[in-house]
A protein has these predicted regions:
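Alpha-helical elements of Rossmann-like donor-binding domains used by nucleotide-donor carbohydrate transfer enzymes
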Residues: 13-16, 42, 149, 156, ...
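Active-site HxH/HxHxD metal-binding segment of metal-dependent hydrolases
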Residues: 5-99
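Metallo-beta-lactamase
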Residues: 5-7, 68, 87, 95, ...
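Aromatic/hydrophobic pocket-lining residues that form the small-molecule binding cavity
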Residues: 37, 150, 154, 229
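Histidine-centered divalent metal-coordination motifs
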Residues: 30-36, 111, 170, 232
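C-terminal regulatory/interaction regions
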Residues: 194-257
Length: 257
């Protein structure tokens, strides 16, 4: 699952971990960011294993994001593996298996439109990739990231009782996944309230809002924080809780309604 970045030493480590009586038969990709998917093609050359994923890097975008991308510059595109494409396209609810194991594919767009989690059946284990991480909440940067989808996917994962141990793409294993998911939901709702409060009396853009509400982070992280804020603002716009100046893009000025 997720061979990682195109680094030769990393490839060698993967191949070295395969014992003489083992074979890599499938390459499963959770999503196509450059720290997860670029090594897949090189690993395939070594193993002849097919690559499984939801789709290319632009698959799974919501109708809203597709329309906004056509109308204006949303910026974004951080860390996207733009050349990625799978051999086998995986749909939500598909099962990927051989004689020894079976994975449930769970489509969880939000961090990226083509994001999948993989649940190893009868093990209690879910590979949650970057949707539920072990050390921080995920970056959601439009148009690749979509906060409406992200929140919906969190609610979706809460309904799965079979998986009580998550292995994320970053950070330690998570042995209390529902508690962590509920924390992420609560945290995002807290940010939403902060955003609405910050523009209740004055109109601001995403960066200005980030500077007001992310007071406890290093200033070098404000650009990333502003992308999260922008994702919230698009979600709030869809819910008719904010209005914006001119065409909706990253430079738009927002006011609460």
């Amino acid at each position: 699952i997720d061979p990682g970045p195109n680094i030769k030493a990393h490839l060698n480590s993967i191949l070295a971990s395969v014992s003489l009586n083992q074979t890599i038969t499938h390459i499963l990709i959770t999503h196509s960011h450059i720290d997860h998917s670029p090594l897949a093609k090189i690993l395939q050359e070594k193993t002849n294993a097919p690559i499984y994923a939801f789709g290319d890097s632009f698959s799974g975008r919501s109708k809203m994001m597709v329309e906004l991308t056509k109308k204006g510059d949303l910026k974004g595109g951080e860390g996207l593996d733009k050349d990625f494409s799978p051999d086998v396209y995986v749909k939500d609810g598909d099962q990927i298996s051989n004689d020894e194991w079976c994975f449930d594919a769970i489509w969880t767009p939000g961090h990226l439109g083509n994001h999948l989690c993989y649940g190893l059946k009868k093990s209690g284990v879910l590979f949650s990739a970057d949707h539920v991480m072990g050390w921080a909440t995920s970056l959601v940067s439009p148009p690749d990231g979509d906060l409406t989808q992200f929140m919906d996917s969190l609610q979706k994962l809460l309904k799965f009782d079979d998986y009580n141990l998550y292995y994320p793409g970053h950070g330690d294993k998570i042995d209390n996944p529902k508690e962590i998911i509920n924390y992420i939901i609560k945290h995002r709702k807290m940010r939403e309230k902060q955003i609405l409060k910050s523009i209740a009396e004055i109109s601001l853009n995403s960066t200005q809002i980030a500077e007001k509400i992310y007071i406890d982070v290093n200033k070098s992280l404000i650009p990333a924080a502003a992308r999260n804020v922008f994702a919230h603002l698009i979600d709030l716009k869809q819910r008719q809780l904010v209005t914006n100046s001119h065409e909706l893009n990253f430079e738009s000025i927002f006011s609460s309604i």
